[in-house]
Regions:
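N-terminal Rossmann-like NAD(P) cofactor-binding subdomain of oxidoreductases
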Residues: 1-171
Length: 171
């Protein structure tokens, strides 16, 4: 078997105690090109846990699986030091007024919203490669887009005729 020359990506997962974070730990721990250097909760950021801020120069990417509002705090301090992939809703909306409307609170890092790249890698690979702040789409847009894009691209359905009615038993 031929060995790959690809370098492993050094990753940190913040918020690994929640559903999204624990699933990400499970997935990335089996990935051949990812080495999880640290994972934990927001305590890592406050200094109550093992602090990673001093070691960011050794990290390639930080996955933020934190409650809404917490990734903003991390990004304010670290967006120039490391690539951040936010799995919360903190950087999905470009307009701070929309964030206030949907989340009921002001965005604390609104100056970073224009820098954030939102999108699926299947559709926005080049933009995501260049970005240091990536807003991962949520479960609804991901499931819908992955299902309908091949149908639209193949000319099998007209995008003007699509109606999505999504429900969740867990949120």
């Amino acid at each position: 078997m031929r060995k790959s020359k690809l370098k492993k990506i050094n990753a940190v997962i913040l918020g690994s105690g929640g559903y999204t974070g624990s699933e990400l730990v499970n997935i990335l721990s089996k990935h051949p090109y990812v080495k999880i250097q640290n994972f934990g909760s927001e305590r890592v950021l406050t200094g109550k846990g093992k602090n990673i801020n001093d070691k960011l120069s050794l990290i390639d990417v930080v996955f933020c699986c934190l409650p809404d509002g917490e990734a903003q705090k991390f990004a304010i301090k670290n967006h120039k030091k490391v690539t951040i992939i936010d799995l919360s809703g903190d950087f999905r909306l470009k307009n701070p007024a929309s964030y206030l409307q949907y989340y009921g609170k002001d965005h604390k890092a609104s100056n970073l919203l224009p820098e954030a790249t939102y999108g699926l890698t299947e559709l926005c690979k080049n933009e995501i490669k260049k970005s240091k702040l990536i807003a991962n789409p949520g479960c609804y847009p991901t499931s819908i887009l992955l299902a309908i894009i091949p149908l639209i691209s193949g000319g099998l359905i007209n995008p003007r005729n699509i109606i999505i009615d999504a429900k969740s038993g867990f949120s």
